């Protein structure tokens, strides 16, 4: 499977076209809208989320609630477009109109794509860069992820994302009873944190950063349960599932690090404290005594829960902006200010869920590759049975 997205942050709409979804997948507009609404929530979101009421329009590839096997096209309209029709319109304008146009940007923001993108594409107005590099694009990535999560759900695979850390405040309570309980608790948390006390402190940290005109980042974790053994491959670098997951997580706006299982902590431990001992269980078959490697060995799944974490840096748009240089005058100035969040880590956990779900669903569809959803489900069950009886 693959998908492409199109659209600017303040353009008329965002679009994604998804190719390769098996026929017979049960998917509705409500399934996608539910994920879009989750992305919009979270303590620390900016005023833009008060304007947008993200809902998907399915324009192809689904009939009567089931996928057809043809490309699925999804559209999410931008409510804010009505305020930007002239500034972001596609029709040509005169030189006089361009010189009078408001909201042109010549002062790049440190940490953003503004300056590098302007140099690369030759844009004197850096709005041409920031409109596409904006995290608003993740709206339709979450929509694509919603389709992937439906594939996984119909194969008995569950995905849950939550927040482990914001602004230096760490969740101490992380031993959730079940993935269902993890979902229940985090959906009720304004910061999507399983540890309620830590969640309150995270909210205080976000409020303090906002009051100071600053922003803060954090760490999110995605857990996937029910993936059969052997998804991925050790044969080539580009078929290793952990490499695909790492690339997907790092492709999320502002993400600068990724780890699996105990992650970088493995560098400070002996091998006997890192690797997961193999045991035999009468019901499960081969399993592991621990899950320090996060459900992945040799580029393949082990049957244990997949555990992926991503590090999100603070958002680079600051209401107390850093020093920059005006590209027209070359004079020092403070950077431009765009309406933004003070912390988007809770929402980013939903985006991380989406991209992780996509990569796993894609690997399963590729590995058990047939064009019908029910036949893929049959093949996945055969693999589970084979692993138990091996």
UniProtKB/Swiss-Prot annotation:
Disulfide bonds: none annotated. NADP(+) binds at residues 39, 45. InterPro entries: Chorismate_synth (IPR000453), Chorismate_synth_AroC_sf (IPR035904), Chorismate_synthase_CS (IPR020541). Its EC number is 4.2.3.5. The keyword NAD does not apply. GO terms for molecular function: chorismate synthase activity; FMN binding. Its cofactor is FMNH2. It comes from the Bacteria. GO terms for biological process: amino acid biosynthetic process; aromatic amino acid family biosynthetic process; chorismate biosynthetic process. It catalyses: 5-O-(1-carboxyvinyl)-3-phosphoshikimate = chorismate + phosphate. GO terms for cellular component: cytosol. Reduced FMN (FMNH(2)). FMN binds at residues 132-134, 253-254, 298, 313-317, 339. The keyword Zinc does not apply. Transmembrane segments: none annotated. This reaction introduces a second double bond into the aromatic ring system. Homotetramer. This is Chorismate synthase. It comes from Bacillus licheniformis (strain ATCC 14580 / DSM 13 / JCM 2505 / CCUG 7422 / NBRC 12200 / NCIMB 9375 / NCTC 10341 / NRRL NRS-1264 / Gibson 46).
């Amino acid at each position: 499977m693959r998908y492409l997205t199109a659209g600017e942050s303040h353009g008329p709409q965002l679009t994604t076209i998804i190719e390769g979804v098996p026929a017979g997948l049960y998917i509705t507009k409500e399934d996608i809208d539910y994920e879009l609404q989750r992305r919009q929530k979270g303590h620390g979101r900016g005023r833009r989320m008060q304007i947008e009421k993200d809902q998907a329009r399915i324009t192809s590839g689904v009939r009567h609630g089931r996928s057809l096997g043809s490309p699925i096209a999804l559209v999410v309209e931008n409510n804010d477009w009505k305020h930007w029709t002239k500034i972001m319109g596609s029709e040509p304008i005169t030189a006089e109109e361009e010189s009078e146009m408001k909201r042109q940007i010549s002062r790049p923001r440190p940490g953003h794509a503004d300056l590098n993108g302007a140099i690369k594409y030759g844009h004197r107005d850096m709005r041409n860069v920031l409109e596409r590099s904006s995290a608003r694009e993740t709206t339709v990535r979450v929509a694509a992820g919603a389709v992937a999560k439906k594939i996984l759900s119909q194969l008995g695979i569950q995905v849950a994302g939550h927040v482990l850390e914001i602004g230096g405040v760490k969740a101490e309570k992380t031993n959730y009873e079940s993935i269902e309980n993890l979902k229940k608790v985090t959906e009720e948390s304004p910061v999507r944190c399983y540890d309620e006390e830590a969640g309150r402190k995270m909210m205080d940290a976000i409020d303090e950063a906002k009051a100071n005109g600053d922003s803060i980042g954090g760490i999110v974790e995605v857990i996937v349960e029910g993936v059969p053994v052997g998804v991925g491959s050790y044969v080539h670098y580009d078929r290793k599932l952990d490499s695909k997951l790492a690339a997907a997580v790092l492709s999320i706006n502002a993400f600068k690090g990724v780890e699996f299982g105990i992650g970088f902590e493995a560098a400070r431990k002996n091998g006997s404290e890192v690797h997961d001992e193999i045991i035999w269980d009468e019901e499960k078959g081969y399993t592991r005594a621990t899950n320090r490697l996060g459900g992945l060995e040799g580029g393949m799944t082990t049957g244990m829960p997949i555990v992926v974490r991503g590090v999100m840096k603070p958002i680079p748009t600051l209401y107390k902006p850093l020093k920059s240089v005006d590209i027209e005058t070359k004079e020092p100035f403070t950077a431009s200010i765009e309406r933004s969040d003070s912390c988007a880590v809770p929402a980013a956990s939903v985006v991380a869920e989406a991209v992780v779900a996509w990569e796993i669903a894609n690997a399963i569809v590729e590995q058990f590759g047939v064009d019908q959803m029910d036949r893929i489900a049959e093949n996945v069950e055969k693999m589970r049975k084979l692993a138990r009886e091996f």
